[in-house]
Amino acid sequence: MAKVAIVYHSGFGHTKILAEAVARGAASVDGTHVDLIPVAEAEAKVETLNAADAIIFGSPTYMGNVSGPFKTWMDTTGKLWYGQQWKDKIAAGFTNSGNPSGDKLNTLTTMWVFAMQHSMIWVSQGVMAGEQENGETLNRLSSWGGTMATSANAEASADNPSKADQATGARLGARVASFAKKLKG
C-alpha cells in the first residue's frame, strides 16, 4: 500500500478545502492510504511523515510566500534533513490566495527548494494549462510546478476555492499517489 501524507496550513479555511480535495484525489488511487495533517500537528506526527512514500505540502500564499506557521514547521525539520530521512520520497505542493497571481509561484518554489533540501523527488501538476477566464477548466492558473488556486475574499465554502481549482488539486493528489505506488513497486 502506498502512503501519502499531506501537510498543510490554512489560515481561513480555503487551503484546508484544497487539501481535502488533494486528499480525495490521492485516495482515489487503489491501494493508497492518505494522512491529512494540519501543520500544527506535523511535529507530533513525524513518524507518519517518515513512513510516508510521498509528502504533499500545502500553504496559503501570504505576502508572496508560504505562511508563517508553514515556514516555522519547515524549519523544525532540520534533524530530519541532517539524517536525510525523506530522501527519495515523492513530493509535491499546492497553494491558494485571494488573487490570480498573488505570487503563488514563489510559494511553490519555496516548497520545491524545501523538498530538494530533503533530497525528495518533485512531481509536477501534469495538467495542460486551462483558460483562466473559464472558471470550470483544470489548471486555469497555468501552473506547472504544483496546484494553484484562487479564492474569493469571502468565507471558505464548497465553492470557494472554485470547483475547478479543487478538481485540479484532486488531480495532483492522484498523480502523486500514482507515482508513489509505482515507486513502491
What does each model-found stretch correspond to?
Residues I90-R140:
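Short, glycine-/small-residue-rich phosphate/pyrophosphate-handling segment
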Residues L18, D30-T32, A54, N96, ...:
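Generic hydrophobic/packing signal
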Residues G135-A152:
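Short glycine/proline-rich, acidic loop/turn segments that cap or connect secondary-structure elements
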Residues M1-W86, G135, N153-G185:
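N-terminal beta1-alpha1-beta2 submodule of the flavodoxin-like/Rossmannoid cofactor-binding fold
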